[in-house]
């Protein structure tokens, strides 16, 4: 199965170079989060020029999953998220947050392996659910997301941990799914 997947990637290459450049550009950025030990890996919101987004999956009723809060700054734009409630239902995460503009709802969707650029494939095949695409429906700008992994905690296959070992935050572009 893995051989077939990589063979298809070879036949239909996608723009890895652009993703790698974006990842390198994120190094050294002021990105920090705090939360519960088993909190979902957080995400960094960035604006999309076209202001659009794409729903990749859908879900039913949600059950409580985790809660965390954080502050991010990316390319001169800062976001403050507090009392963020994350609810998981198979393929969908529903995130409610409070920020300067008031209450908003973020709908986050897991991506499948097929949605990732090859540079992200090794992580996906390691058993981590690393992909989220997020959009703030109350924000007229529209957002895609950069996914953040907390390497302080041991990785899990349910998306509630980080990559095992180290203390560095690793960023993966969920925007590649678009």
Curated annotation (Swiss-Prot):
Instruction: Provide this UniProt record's keywords sorted from A to Z.
Output: Signal
**Superkingdom of source:** Viruses
Q: Does the keyword Signal apply?
A: yes
- The positions making up the signal sequence are 1-18
What protein name is recorded for this chain? Protein 105R
Taxonomic lineage from the root? Viruses, Varidnaviria, Bamfordvirae, Preplasmiviricota, Tectiliviricetes
């Amino acid at each position: 199965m893995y051989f077939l997947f990589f063979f298809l990637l070879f036949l239909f290459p996608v723009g890895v170079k652009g993703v790698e450049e974006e990842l390198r550009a994120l190094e050294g950025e002021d990105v920090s989060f705090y939360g519960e030990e088993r909190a979902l890996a957080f995400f960094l919101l960035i604006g999309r020029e076209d202001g659009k987004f794409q729903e990749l999956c859908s879900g039913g009723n949600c059950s409580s999953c985790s809660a965390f809060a954080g502050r991010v700054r990316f390319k001169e734009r800062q976001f403050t998220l507090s009392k963020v409630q994350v609810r998981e239902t198979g393929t969908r995460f529903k995130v409610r947050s409070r920020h300067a503009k008031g209450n908003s709802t973020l709908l986050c969707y897991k991506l499948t392996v097929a949605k990732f650029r090859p540079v992200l494939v090794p992580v996906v095949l390691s058993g981590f659910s690393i992909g989220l695409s997020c959009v703030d429906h109350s924000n007229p700008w529209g957002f895609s997301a950069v996914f953040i992994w907390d390497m302080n905690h041991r990785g899990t296959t349910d998306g509630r941990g980080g990559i095992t070992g180290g203390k560095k935050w690793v960023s993966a572009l969920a925007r590649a799914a678009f």
